[in-house]
């Protein structure tokens, strides 16, 4: 389970607290308030900050600012230099990550895509291979669809099992991530939640 070498189970979130969420009266960043919010996350058991969500500026400069805060409180960081709903990142973006973000002790890798279809797996796989070639100790984070996604319009695969098989075959990330909205407000759990979990677990154990 410890795919990132943390010495503990990796726990993160989706939407983030951006470095510019808190400002002083003159408009400058209030890093102490930002640090306090991330300290609360760490105290709750979260050990990886995921830089995604309602972010209006994913610049390298902003991410370096947040990395400095995370280094102070002992959290790790998965950035998003390219964003997760755009074209596959370029070689130039890998170079920027390697130069400016990867040297940080808090940096784990880069989030490049949320819920890709299978038609994107070849390109994503090539990007992951190049990322690992340049930074073998870092990783690319990709979040997949859940089992209830539409096969034709979302998965672009015949079925969910084939979708997972195709991803594992073509994209060599350290972790296989997917989202599943399974815990309902009334306390129930949707009927395929554990089926999805069991399928992904069995597939990844075979790798």
Regions found by a protein language model. Give the residues of each.
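Glycan-processing catalytic domains of CAZymes
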Residues: 1-207
